[in-house]
Amino acid sequence: MTSGDERIKAKKEFILQGFTAKTHCEAIARLFDVPGIQRVIVSVAFVNRSGTELLKHQLKKYAAKTKAFIGIRNDITSTQGAKHLLDLGVSLLLVDTGSRSVLFHPKLYLAKGAEHARLVIGSANFTMGGLNNNIEAGFAIELDLKNSDEKALVEGIEKEFDALTKDYPDHVIPITKAAELDALQATGRLIDEMTTSPPRPASAATSP
């Protein structure tokens, strides 16, 4: 017989940004409605200032509980975006694979409370395009931590990300000062939004 605990099912919402009125920005903002937030994890390939501006109020309120894993050495993540996260008080970890041909690319946003958690996972980076303008797909999932399977899922996510710094100390870089970001920009691992044009997708008309 299945217990009442096990009958509870996670609520899932599909987000098809660009073709519907739903956006990842709105879905991620709702993560912060979880009662009694204890922890927030953000993991993305790319971040820029226009992206962080969209969620700055939520991030500032829960900065002390937020850990952000951000990919670098990808010609998109900017010094300005990373500095904004640092200024907001977020615990910032930059992930450098050491190669431009192998990117840190997971896109995941998690807020965990005492009894509930919310998760957004899909294709959306922490940029204006990823959160609002691009055609993106993802799932927003509400999880009940009284359900053993859903609790295990959330704890598994936490465990995997918590292990990154210990398991890959040469590639996961904790940032505590703006000067560290300036040094990464100087070596080409972060871009300067003031001097770098946004990437343009190749097309039949523009490709050599």
Where does each model-flagged region fall?
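PLD/PLD-like phosphodiesterase catalytic module centered on the HKD motif
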Residues: 1-208
